[in-house]
Design a protein with these regions (language model features):
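Rossmann-like AdoMet/SAM-dependent catalytic core
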Residues: 1-68, 72, 77
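Long, charge-rich, low-complexity alpha-helical segments
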Residues: 61-128
Length: 128
C-alpha cells in the first residue's frame, strides 16, 4: 500500500464514486480534473524507440496502486491541472494525432472512461 493514512483517501474515493454515479459521459468530459500530488509516471522504452512499450501511473499514497496507461491516458494525467476539461484534452490529442472523426470519438470515450477510473481510484481529483 501507499504511504500515509488511508481514512481520508477512502472517504474521498467514496464521495467521488457517489458524485460520478450521477454524471453522464458529457458531464465527465466537462470535468477539469487535477492529478493527485502523489502520482508519478514511469515509462519503459526500448532504446531508440519513439514510443514507450509500457506507461505506468503510480500512486504514492492511498492504496499505492499502479495502473498501466495508454499514451492518451498518460497525456490526460500529464495535463490534469484543473485548467482543461477532459473533452478539451481529448480534442487536442485528437488534433495533434490527426485522427479522423470516428477515431477522435473513440479517443474521447477512452479518456472519459479513464477519467472515471482515475477519479474513483484517487489518481485524479474532480477539480472544478
Amino acid at each position: 500500500s501507499g504511504q500515509g493514512v488511508l481514512g481520508p483517501h477512502v472517504a474521498e474515493v467514496l464521495e467521488v464514486r457517489e458524485r460520478l454515479a450521477g454524471l453522464d459521459d458529457a458531464a465527465v468530459a466537462d470535468l477539469r480534473p487535477l492529478l493527485a500530488p502523489d502520482v508519478t509516471e514511469e515509462r519503459h522504452l526500448i532504446p531508440g524507440a519513439a514510443e514507450p512499450t509500457v506507461i505506468l501511473l503510480r500512486q504514492g499514497g492511498g492504496l499505492g496502486r499502479t495502473l498501466q496507461a495508454s499514451t492518451a491516458v498518460a497525456a490526460l494525467a500529464g495535463v490534469a491541472d484543473g485548467e482543461l476539461s477532459v473533452g478539451q484534452v481529448a480534442s487536442a490529442v485528437a488534433a495533434l494525432s490527426e485522427l479522423n472523426a470516428a477515431d477522435a470519438a473513440a479517443l474521447r470515450a477512452e479518456m472519459v472512461e479513464a477519467t472515471r477510473h482515475l477519479l474513483t481510484t484517487g489518481f485524479l481529483h474532480p477539480g472544478k
